């Protein structure tokens, strides 16, 4: 530190400091920039071949685009390859695919009806490969078929497969005609005298209340259904009794549970 301090003090008192700095700058400006390799040559170092990094720089100035060879023009077909077993000469479009029979195996089981001391049990096996949504739809379909049995006799329905699924239709049964001896003074009820319950659509039926203070419930098929077609579409049929048709209408209008609590159905 003492020597460095002395040098600084000496330079402060040196009268020609500015002139010396200017001469040094002038010498540096006139000096040609040379690489370390060229400086070594000036010092008499034995000359050798330029290093690879200098040659790469020199070659970059004279570099030209390489010639692109046409591989297709140089291609010579191998005669032996054409004689290999299984080689088919000609365009691929001429190759005729062979028809192959594909067989899909499945472990699906047909519905099984079992009987034991507890009663009958029907087992339905899910089809394979169903997604979660498809499984839910399949179960909803089975449930809807079972619930529809409340409104019609499934055993009497016709089954028809279509492109969109299955169509089940109610089979219209022709009543048998029996020869009977009429009984005098026998008056059939109004519901028995008609062949189609819808003929009583304007006839009201009355249900008595379970508790005192309530008015009887009087209702007709016309009040529950807008037309016979609507009555049939929800499971009604002409062979129903008048009361069965009325109860069907209450269920259809979602009034049945409320009515059976208050009235004797």
From Swiss-Prot:
InterPro entries per record: P-protein-C_vesiculovirus (IPR048220), Phosphoprotein_C_viral (IPR043036), Phosphoprotein_central (IPR037263)
Disulfide bonds: none
UniProt region (Oligomerization), positions on chain: 109-170
Tagged with keyword GTP-binding: no
Keywords from the named record: Chaperone, Host cytoplasm, Phosphoprotein, Viral RNA replication, Virion
Location(s), subcellular: Virion; Host cytoplasm
Positions of region (Interaction with N(0)): 1-60
Site (Involved in oligomerization): 138, 141
Region of interest: Disordered: 42-74
Complex and partners: Homodimer. Interacts with the L polymerase; the association of P and L forms the polymerase complex and positions P optimally for encapsidation of newly synthesized genomes with the nucleoprotein. Interacts (via N-terminus) with N(0). Interacts (via C-terminus) with N in ribonucleocapsid (via C-terminus); this interaction allows to package the L polymerase in the virion and positions the polymerase on the template, since P acts as a bridge between N and L.
Family of the protein in this entry: Belongs to the vesiculovirus protein P family.
Record's protein name: Phosphoprotein
Organism: Vesicular stomatitis Indiana virus (strain 85CLB South America) (VSIV)
């Amino acid at each position: 530190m003492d020597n460095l301090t002395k040098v600084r003090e000496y330079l402060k008192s040196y009268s020609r400091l500015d002139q010396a700095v200017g001469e040094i700058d002038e010498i540096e400006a006139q000096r040609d920039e040379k690489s370390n390799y060229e400086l070594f040559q000036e010092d008499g170092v034995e000359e050798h071949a330029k290093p690879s990094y200098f040659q790469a720089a020199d070659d970059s100035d004279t570099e030209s685009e390489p010639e692109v060879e046409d591989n297709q023009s140089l291609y010579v077909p191998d005669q032996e390859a054409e004689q290999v077993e299984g080689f088919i000469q000609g365009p691929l479009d001429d190759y005729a695919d062979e028809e192959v029979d594909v067989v899909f195996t499945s472990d699906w089981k047909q519905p099984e009806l079992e009987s034991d001391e507890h009663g009958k049990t029907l087992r339905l096996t899910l089809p394979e490969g169903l997604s979660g949504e498809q499984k839910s739809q399949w179960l909803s379909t089975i449930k809807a078929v079972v619930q529809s049995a409340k409104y019609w006799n499934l055993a009497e329905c016709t089954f028809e497969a279509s492109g969109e699924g299955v169509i089940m239709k109610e089979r219209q049964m022709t009543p048998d005609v029996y020869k009977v001896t009429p009984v005098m003074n026998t008056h059939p009820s109004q519901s028995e005298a008609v062949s189609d319950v819808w003929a009583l659509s304007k006839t009201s039926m009355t249900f008595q209340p379970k508790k005192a203070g309530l008015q009887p419930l009087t209702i007709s098929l016309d009040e529950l259904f807008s037309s016979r077609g609507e009555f049939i579409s929800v499971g009604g049929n002409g062979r129903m009794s008048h009361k069965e048709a009325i109860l069907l209408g209450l269920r259809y209008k979602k009034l049945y549970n409320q009515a059976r609590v208050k009235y004797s159905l």
